[in-house]
Swiss-Prot record:
InterPro entries: Na/K_ATPase_sub_beta, Na/K_ATPase_sub_beta_sf. This is Sodium/potassium-transporting ATPase subunit beta-1. Belongs to the X(+)/potassium ATPases subunit beta family. One of its GO terms (biological process) is intracellular sodium ion homeostasis. It comes from Tetronarce californica. Glycans are attached at N114, N159, N194, N267. The lineage of its organism: Eukaryota, Metazoa, Chordata, Craniata, Vertebrata.
């Protein structure tokens, strides 16, 4: 006769969950569970303490106003407005809708340069009307409230200011673009030491307090088609004046206005796509084939009749 299979499983999983005889939950008494809880509480508490401590030590070595390591920061890039998709500005003189986005881009950039926002009890100060030397305002590390910033008057951009022509020349087929150097904290741009190494068009107007900018046709055959290019900036100079540098960062100069240069193409050949390259010149301005915006930018312009 076959032996009957024992059906006694010792209580099974129910007894494992709660053993009333031994007063155990999941195989452990209350005292055992308490010891385990205290152990892990202390263990993870120590881990959290070590983590928080290392973070605190690291924060003590970091300035609230200046990055600790800046040796790999590249020289500033040169950017422009209006921002164009695939760097292409294409519009029709007879169709205002075709250049509406370009005009709105310029308005968005220049709205902070309105004179009303630079008047009254503000951190702005007059730094002259002609280019001058750097204006230093103490160490970056010190926090003494907001540091003063130089005013930049919209009227200096003349035809590209939008004051007299709200279309910035687009309605007449004479488009404007606004160039600016990207902000780098604590950067002192160095102008060319002399004008002999500059393009011939810049040599006559060399200024020791300005980083000049120059635009020209990318292709030799486009030089005649591009025609005359006019530059508008502080003191009538097409470049970036030194008194707006160095930049102290958003925490100390949240109202900082970087200098701008208005560039207007006054007699472009219509119905032809023209490729233009603009470069800023300085002793510590670099250019790179890998980064096409480093010290320069390219833009394609097509004015349709």
């Amino acid at each position: 006769m076959a032996r009957e299979k024992s059906t006694d499983d010792g209580g099974g999983w129910k007894k494992f969950l709660w053993d009333s005889e031994k007063k155990q939950v999941l195989g452990r008494t209350g005292t055992s569970w308490f010891k385990i809880f205290v152990f892990y509480l202390i263990f993870y508490g120590c881990l959290a303490g070590i983590f928080i401590g290392t973070i605190q030590v690291m924060l003590l070595t970091i300035s609230d106003f200046e990055p600790k390591y800046q040796d790999r920061v590249a020289p500033p890039g040169l950017s422009h407005s209006p921002y164009a998709v695939k760097t292409e500005i294409s519009f029709s003189v007879s169709n205002p809708n075709s250049y509406e986005n370009h005009v709105n881009g310029l308005k968005e950039l220049l709205k902070n340069y309105n004179e009303s926002k630079q008047d009254g009890n503000t951190p702005f100060e007059d730094c002259g009307v002609i280019p001058a030397d750097y204006i230093t305002r103490g160490p970056i590390e010190e926090s003494q409230g907001q540091k003063r910033v130089c005013r930049f008057l919209l009227q200096w951009l003349k035809n590209c200011s939008g004051i007299d022509d709200p279309s910035y020349g687009y309605s007449e087929g004479k488009p404007c673009i606004i160039a600016k150097l990207n902000r780098i904290l604590g950067f002192y741009p160095k102008p060319p030491k002399n004008g002999t190494d500059l393009p011939e068009a810049l040599q006559a107007n060399y200024n020791q307090y300005v980083l000049p900018i120059h635009c020209q046709a990318k292709k030799e055959e486009d030089k005649v088609r591009i025609g005359t290019i006019e530059y508008f900036g502080m003191g009538g100079v097409g470049g970036f004046p030194l008194q707006y540098y160095p930049y102290y960062g958003k925490r100390l100069q949240k109202n900082y206005l970087q200098p701008l240069v208005g560039i207007q193409f006054t007699n472009l050949t219509h119905n032809v796509e023209l490729r233009v390259e603009c470069k800023v010149f300085g002793d510590n301005i670099a250019y790179s084939e890998k980064d096409r915006s480093l010290g320069r930018f390219e833009v394609k312009i097509e004015v349709k009749s």
